[in-house]
């Protein structure tokens, strides 16, 4: 799914969210384990450059969490690449909990360290 924040037809922020996790996610000590599409993964979240600092990423995350509750999703998982401290702060502020740091290979960046975060929906 593509979640989008628009203003007057202009996309200000967007996120790709679905239940398709990377194989490395299986070895993470999540509180909520993946089964039968009960967990969503935020794969990418982006805010238009000139719109940064306006709280749009926070609003988009809140929208994703709200929709996940309506869809009976039990948790949201994601990873943050090493040195992206702004993303770490964003997700922690939104209520995500740090789980672990893992080596993950993505074609775009190669083998890197990623911090794993989880939001358990209650």
Features from the language model and the residues they span:
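Conserved acyl-donor/pantetheine-binding loop and adjacent beta-alpha core of acyl/acetyltransferases
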Residues: 15-44, 52, 107-108
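Conserved acetyl-CoA-binding loop-helix of GNAT-fold acetyltransferases
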Residues: 47, 53-66, 89-93
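C-terminal "cap" of GNAT-fold acetyltransferases
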Residues: 36, 81-85, 93-94, 104-122
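Conserved beta-hairpin
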Residues: 1-15
């Amino acid at each position: 799914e593509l979640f989008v924040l628009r203003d007057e037809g202009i996309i200000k922020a967007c996120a790709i969210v679905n239940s398709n996790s990377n194989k490395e996610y299986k070895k993470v000590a999540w509180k909520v384990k993946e089964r039968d599409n009960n967990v969503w993964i935020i794969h990418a979240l982006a805010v238009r450059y000139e719109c940064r600092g306006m709280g749009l990423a926070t609003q988009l995350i809140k929208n994703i969490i709200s929709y996940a509750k309506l869809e009976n999703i039990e948790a949201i998982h994601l990873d943050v690449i090493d040195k992206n401290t702004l993303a770490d702060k964003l997700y922690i502020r939104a209520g995500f909990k740090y789980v672990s740091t893992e080596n993950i290979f993505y074609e775009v960046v190669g083998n890197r360290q990623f911090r794993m975060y989880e939001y358990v929906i209650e």
